[in-house]
């Protein structure tokens, strides 16, 4: 267990090394604001804390809280389509049972997540609840078990509200790739929420649920968090068990989480993280109580980030990045400087190599992982004259276009004669990316960049241009290749929609240093006094 905060300072070990060639960051701009809603702007507050306190005091019941969220979900879901399945009856029963236990004085009834409504991305297995992966090939599939992350949430008292929409098997950046529906962005329903965890991000943004789980293979938590104006966390590879997560690219897949505040996100991570005997890649490192290390706004010093060294990656602010995004990130960097940190530009020359390497490696692993969906072991079965036809027709009818394309790309990269030219070289690039991040993180406590090169774009804008869509992952894939933790916190707005479109700041750190990211993210979030990240969909009086 790490030591408690002392004198309310950020606990980051700072290594003094010889000064490398780099440029001091300078920016006159401040964090961009926009008239986001009619609500008064101010720091994000913890919904989890509020729910817990109201249950303990008897001010509210779990049934009341569940009814409130279900009511909001029913009003907004026809527009957003965030959920593939809503378990409303089960949620109401669980809430009533929680109230009964509290009333009878059972001391363990109010767990850390008691009464907290959670959305679960539909590529995480949930017992006796549809788990489709966003694919027709698993339509109607109901697992007999919970994914480890889901089980731990339930054990902490959380109520699973339903399964959120996603790009099929996590392959996409818009949630348009779902076999069932297209999710829209709560900030502008003509725009995408990002992906592949777009349903989870949109649901938290619209307050359809308190928090949600997602998965992140190349940015699938962080990019939609940026597009929807919520907090998104991709933990270190191995920090959270992958048992029960439908495999896309097993060396890259990570279970992540969304919240409307850093505190809520930290609370969820503490619950779901930790070693799991069902996942050999899960880490046995001790899991801190991340939320307890966060300092309330009234206790913050005037320069709470004194001594913290932050590197802003030069390659993420150049060609191909929207000017409004660059301005927001530079404004966020200036804000971090005002809080006492030293912000300098740092170059990662291998940064641009990560994107092609990622798509080769991820597609190669997907071509193997998805071979299990053959119409016999998993998936809907079609009538056929022989076994080969059964395999072919089941997969042709069950998989969508993007999934088929990535399977073909991965099979090609692994085939004889091309393995060395593609897969082997991509693995070599991955090693290079890991080393470049390791070197940079020996000089800086945290690295920052945009979470995406643009804000949310129009539905249909890139669906027929896969290269343009893939290029949108440039900011996030390197973190997965390196296995590092990353946190996205809303930092500003760009023009678009009726009230502006949110932009997210990505913070990256060393392995298993989620606590550092959460502490910096919390301080950053709590000192953004002039911004509100509640979407216009939830106008005053409709919350």
Swiss-Prot record:
It catalyses: L-glutamyl-tRNA(Gln) + L-glutamine + ATP + H2O = L-glutaminyl-tRNA(Gln) + L-glutamate + ADP + phosphate + H(+). It is an enzyme of class 6 (ligase). Coiled coil: none annotated. One of its GO terms (biological process) is mitochondrial translation. GO terms for cellular component: chloroplast stroma; glutamyl-tRNA(Gln) amidotransferase complex; mitochondrion. One of its GO terms (molecular function) is hydrolase activity, acting on carbon-nitrogen (but not peptide) bonds, in linear amides. It comes from the Eukaryota. This protein may be expected to contain an N-terminal transit peptide but none has been predicted. Belongs to the amidase family. GatA subfamily. This is Glutamyl-tRNA(Gln) amidotransferase subunit A, chloroplastic/mitochondrial. It comes from Zea mays (Maize).
């Amino acid at each position: 267990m790490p030591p408690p905060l002392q004198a309310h300072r950020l606990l980051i070990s700072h290594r003094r090394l010889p000064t490398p060639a780099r440029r001091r960051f300078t920016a006159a701009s401040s964090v961009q604001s926009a008239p986001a809603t009619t609500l008064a702007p101010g720091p994000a507050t913890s919904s989890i804390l509020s729910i817990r306190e109201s249950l303990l005091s008897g001010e509210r019941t779990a049934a009341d809280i569940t009814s409130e969220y279900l009511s909001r979900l029913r009003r907004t879901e026809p527009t957003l389509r965030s959920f593939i399945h809503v378990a409303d009856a089960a949620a109401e029963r669980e809430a009533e049972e929680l109230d009964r236990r509290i009333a009878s004085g059972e001391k363990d009834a109010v767990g850390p997540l008691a009464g907290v409504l959670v959305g679960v991305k539909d590529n995480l297995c949930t017992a006796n609840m549809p788990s489709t992966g966003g694919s027709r090939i698993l339509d109607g599939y109901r697992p007999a078990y919970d994914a480890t992350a889901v089980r731990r949430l339930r054990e902490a008292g959380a109520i699973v509200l339903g399964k959120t929409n996603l790009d099929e098997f996590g392959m996409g950046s818009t949630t348009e790739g779902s076999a069932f529906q297209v999710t829209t962005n709560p900030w502008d329903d003509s725009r995408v929420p990002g992906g592949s965890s777009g349903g989870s991000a949109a649901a938290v943004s619209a307050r359809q649920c308190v928090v949600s789980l997602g998965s992140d293979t190349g940015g699938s938590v962080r990019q939609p968090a940026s597009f929807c104006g919520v907090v998104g966390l991709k933990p270190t590879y191995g920090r959270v068990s992958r048992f029960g997560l439908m495999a896309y690219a097993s060396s890259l897949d990570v279970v992540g989480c969304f919240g409307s505040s850093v505190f809520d996100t930290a609370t969820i991570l503490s619950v779901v993280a930790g070693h799991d005997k069902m996942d050999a890649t899960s880490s046995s490192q001790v899991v801190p109580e991340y939320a307890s290390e966060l300092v309330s706004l009234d206790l913050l010093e005037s320069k709470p980030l004194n001594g913290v060294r932050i590197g802003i990656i030069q390659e993420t602010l150049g060609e191909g990045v929207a000017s409004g995004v660059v301005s927001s990130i530079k404004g966020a960097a200036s804000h971090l400087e005002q809080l006492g940190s030293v912000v300098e530009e740092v170059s990662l020359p291998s940064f641009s190599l990560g994107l092609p390497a990622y798509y080769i490696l991820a597609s190669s692993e997907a071509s193997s992982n998805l071979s299990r969906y053959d119409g016999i072991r998993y998936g809907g079965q079609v009538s056929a004259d022989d076994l080969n036809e059964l395999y072919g027709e089941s997969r042709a009818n069950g998989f969508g276009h993007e999934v088929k394309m990535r399977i073909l790309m991965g099979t090609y990269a692994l085939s004889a004669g091309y393995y060395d030219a593609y897969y082997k070289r991509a693995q070599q690039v991955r090693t290079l990316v890991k080393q470049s991040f390791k070197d940079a993180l020996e000089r800086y406590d945290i690295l920052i960049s945009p979470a995406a090169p643009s804000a949310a774009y129009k539905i249909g804008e890139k669906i027929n241009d896969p290269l343009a869509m893939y290029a949108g992952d440039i900011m996030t894939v390197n973190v997965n290749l390196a296995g590092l933790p990353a946190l996205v916190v809303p930092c500003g707005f760009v023009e678009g929609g009726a009230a502006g479109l949110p932009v997210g700041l990505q913070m990256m750190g060393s392995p298993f240093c989620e606590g550092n990211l959460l502490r910096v993210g919390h301080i950053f979030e709590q000192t953004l006094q002039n911004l509100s990240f509640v979407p216009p969909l939830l106008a005053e009086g409709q919350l």
